[in-house]
Curated annotation (Swiss-Prot):
Keyword Acetylation: no
Family note: Belongs to the RnpA family.
Gene3D superfamilies, per the entry: 3.30.230.10
A molecular function GO annotation: tRNA binding
Keywords from the UniProt entry: Endonuclease, Hydrolase, Nuclease, RNA-binding, tRNA processing
Coiled coil feature spans: none
InterPro entries: Ribosomal_Su5_D2-typ_SF, Ribsml_uS5_D2-typ_fold_subgr, RNase_P, RNase_P_CS
The organism of origin for this protein: Shewanella woodyi (strain ATCC 51908 / MS32)
Name of this protein: Ribonuclease P protein component
EC number: 3.1.26.5
Subunit structure: Consists of a catalytic RNA component (M1 or rnpB) and a protein subunit.
Record-linked HAMAP family: RNase_P
Alphabetized PANTHER family for the sequence: RIBONUCLEASE P PROTEIN COMPONENT
Lineage: Bacteria, Pseudomonadati, Pseudomonadota, Gammaproteobacteria, Alteromonadales
Cellular component terms per the entry's GO annotation: ribonuclease P complex
Length: 119
């Protein structure tokens, strides 16, 4: 059986209720620029929701770049993550980061979140 690296609708948090549930007693992994909040879900796979506030990232093309990089990184690492719902909160300082830097930071946060969930 081959591993699929697609990013389908079922891998996303879609409704406000799904987002809200993650904010109640989450497992956290954070850096100065990004915070990951997670709770266990009843699915067989992880799901992700992204929030990039205009307050921190003013221009739409910058917000889109950040979301695209995080989504792509999640798509590549989804099979290493447990069945959890994750909300990614982006804060100040991400705009100045290069794409490669952002990729490394997000990978580090996935590992940190995985350790906190499993241990």
């Amino acid at each position: 059986m081959t591993i699929s690296y697609t990013f389908t609708r079922e891998l996303r948090l879609l409704t406000p209720a799904q987002f809200k549930s993650v904010f109640s007693k989450p497992i956290k992994a954070s850096s100065a620029e990004i915070t990951l909040l997670a709770i266990p879900n009843t699915e067989q796979h992880p799901r992700i929701g992204l929030t990039v506030a205009k307050r921190f990232v003013k221009k739409a093309h910058q917000r889109n770049r950040i979301k695209r990089i995080i989504r792509d990184n999640f798509r590549l690492h989804q099979h290493e993550l447990p069945a959890i719902d994750i909300v990614v909160l982006v804060r100040n300082g991400v705009v100045e980061m290069e794409n490669a830097e952002l990729h490394k930071l997000v990978e580090k946060l996935w590992r940190k979140l995985n350790r906190r969930y499993n241990g």
